[in-house]
Every structure is written in structure tokens, then in C-alpha cells.
């Protein structure tokens, strides 16, 4: 089933990452690099099986392609999934191992914080690769992206209200 899913997904590259000693099981999905390197966060959560994690990674990476293009960014779309419960299975070793996989892609994929991960996790990824955004400001990063995400969501709501009701206030 996994290969059938990959054959019809239209993705450029999918990487399965495994390091049992580090507790790492992950999937990196690169949907498109037409506009530039694939950019998208890494989320950590439990899945019923690998197929469910793959399906999520493919769906989310495709969405990132469109989201980044609509935002006018010179980046493509990608997404990564760390399979595991962030409350009980999150380790420095897993994120550093993931960082080595990201680094092996040579800049084709740039990762960032997403559901189940935080700035400290991105710091562990950063210890292994430069292809990560959202690290602490002392390392030249933007830090926690939550305020920017909230602002973007607010702007989207305001634009929707303006479109519906014609009032810019």
C-alpha cells in the first residue's frame, strides 16, 4: 500500500528516517522544489500505523506547496512527521537524528516547528543542520513562531470579514 500511495502522490521525494537507538521514526515528504527549497514544519504525534503517518505527511507537504506559493515565497512545499507521542517519546537524540537526515538532503528541505514540537526541539535539530528555522534568537532565529501564526490567522479573518461585509475596520 505504501508504494501505491507514493506512485500516485506527485511528490518529488519521500525519505523514511529510522534510528532505533535514538528512538527516531520519521518521514520527510518533499512535494515541490519548483519555487525553491521545500519549507514546512515537522510535527510529532502518534499514528495508528506508518501508512497513516505517510498519508498525513503527503497531504501536509502538498498543502505547504500551495500555502508558500500563495504567500509569494520563493520556497516549495515539504513536511516531516516524527512518529511518537510528544508527551512521552520526545528525546534530544531523536531530534538530532532527524537533523542529520535533514542535513543529508543538502538544503532541498528546510524544517521548522509544528504541532508537538517547540523551539527547544528545533535547537536540537540545529545542532546537526543549518536547514532549520525557528531556533532561538541568540542563534539568529525568529524564536517561537506562534505570535506570527496568530497574526497571520487574524489577518486572514479580517480579510474574510472585509470581503463579506465590505468594511475595512
Residue spans for each PLM region:
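N-terminal ligand-binding/catalytic initiation module
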Residues: 1-143
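Hydrophobic, well-ordered beta-alpha structural blocks that scaffold small-molecule cofactor pockets
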Residues: 132-169
Amino acid at each position: 500500500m505504501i508504494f501505491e500511495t507514493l506512485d500516485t502522490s506527485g511528490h518529488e521525494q519521500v525519505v523514511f528516517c529510522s534510528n532505533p537507538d535514538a528512538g527516531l521514526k520519521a518521514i520527510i515528504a518533499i512535494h515541490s522544489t519548483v519555487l525553491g527549497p521545500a519549507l514546512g514544519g515537522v510535527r510529532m504525534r502518534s499514528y495508528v500505523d506508518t501508512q497513516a503517518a505517510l498519508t498525513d505527511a503527503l497531504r501536509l507537504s502538498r498543502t505547504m506547496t500551495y500555502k508558500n506559493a500563495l504567500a509569494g515565497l520563493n520556497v516549495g512545499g515539504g513536511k516531516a512527521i516524527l512518529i511518537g507521542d510528544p508527551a512521552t517519546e520526545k528525546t534530544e537524540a531523536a531530534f538530532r537524528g532527524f537533523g542529520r537526515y535533514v542535513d543529508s538532503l543538502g538544503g532541498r528541505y528546510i524544517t521548522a516547528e509544528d504541532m508537538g514540537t517547540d523551539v527547544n526541539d528545533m535547537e536540537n535539530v540545529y545542532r546537526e543542520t543549518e536547514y532549520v528555522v525557528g531556533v532561538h534568537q541568540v542563534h539568529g532565529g525568529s524564536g517561537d513562531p506562534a505570535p506570527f501564526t496568530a497574526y497571520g490567522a487574524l489577518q486572514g479573518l479580517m480579510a474574510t470579514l472585509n470581503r463579506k461585509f465590505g468594511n475595512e475596520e
